[in-house]
Regions:
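Conserved, mostly hydrophobic/aromatic
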Residues: 15, 22, 50, 100, ...
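Generic structural signal for well-ordered alpha-helices
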Residues: 16-19, 44-51, 68-72, 87-90, ...
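Short, well-ordered coil/turn segments that N-cap beta-strands
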Residues: 5-9, 26-28, 54-59, 78-80, ...
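Glycine-rich, proline-tolerant flexible connector loops at the mouths of alpha/beta enzymes
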Residues: 18-46, 65, 81-93, 118-133
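N-terminal amphipathic alpha-helix/helix-capping segment at the start of soluble metabolic enzymes
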Residues: 1-12, 16
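Catalytic cores of alpha/beta
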Residues: 18-24, 66-73, 129-140, 148-154
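Conserved anion-binding
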Residues: 59, 66-116, 151-154
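C-terminal alpha-helical cap/extension of soluble enzyme domains
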Residues: 138-183
Length: 183
């Protein structure tokens, strides 16, 4: 998508129904996050559920146990990519033939992650300067959530944050007597 100059739309979700709605809406990447202190076994269940609800989108899953065996288990559960931090972890998992969504905290980490086999990068809290540096340093897409912006190749956002904004707009429209999209 980076080569096509098309921004990547990513959303974090944990269940089949939400994944189906996101997939039908044209979301490019659905990521199963480990926020909420989910255990590894719970992530396997969430990953399988998201895979069942997804036809077109790429599915990634956070890897709290950065081992090749754990990465294989997530791939077997339906993850197209596993999301992990640390260049050594990315290197080992990519060398095992499992596509990696690398998580970084500074622009200096972007190129080493690409060099060891990352397919995609999640750069949280990037800001315009550091984010632009990371994007320029690599040929793979660099996404971001909080602190990200148009300088990145795409964005990640948790579904509940998107849903909250959409529901607030819906409530405002109904209360103001405005037409509601989809009527």
């Amino acid at each position: 998508m980076k080569r096509e100059w098309r921004k990547i739309v990513g959303v974090v979700a944990w269940d089949e129904g939400t994944a189906r709605a996101l997939d039908e809406a044209g979301v490019d990447l659905i990521s199963v996050g480990d926020s909420g202190a989910a255990s590894f076994d719970e992530l396997l269940v969430f990953c399988a559920a998201v895979r069942r609800g997804t036809v077109h989108a790429v599915v990634s899953c956070d890897l709290p146990e950065p081992t090749v065996d754990a990465a294989r288990r997530l791939a077997d559960a339906g993850a197209d990519l596993v999301k992990v931090e640390g260049v050594e972890n990315v290197c080992a998992i990519a060398a095992a033939g499992i596509p990696v969504f690398a998580q970084i905290a500074s622009s200096a980490e972007a190129k080493p992650m690409e060099d060891v086999g990352a397919a995609l990068i999640d750069f949280r809290h990037s800001g315009p300067e550091a984010g632009s540096e990371a994007v320029a340093a690599v040929s793979i897409p660099v996404l971001g959530g909080l602190g990200g912006g148009p300088w990145l190749d795409g964005r990640m956002r948790a579904v509940y944050k998107l849903l909250g904004g959409a529901l607030a707009a819906y409530a405002d429209d109904v209360r103001a007597g405005r037409p509601v999209k989809g009527d």
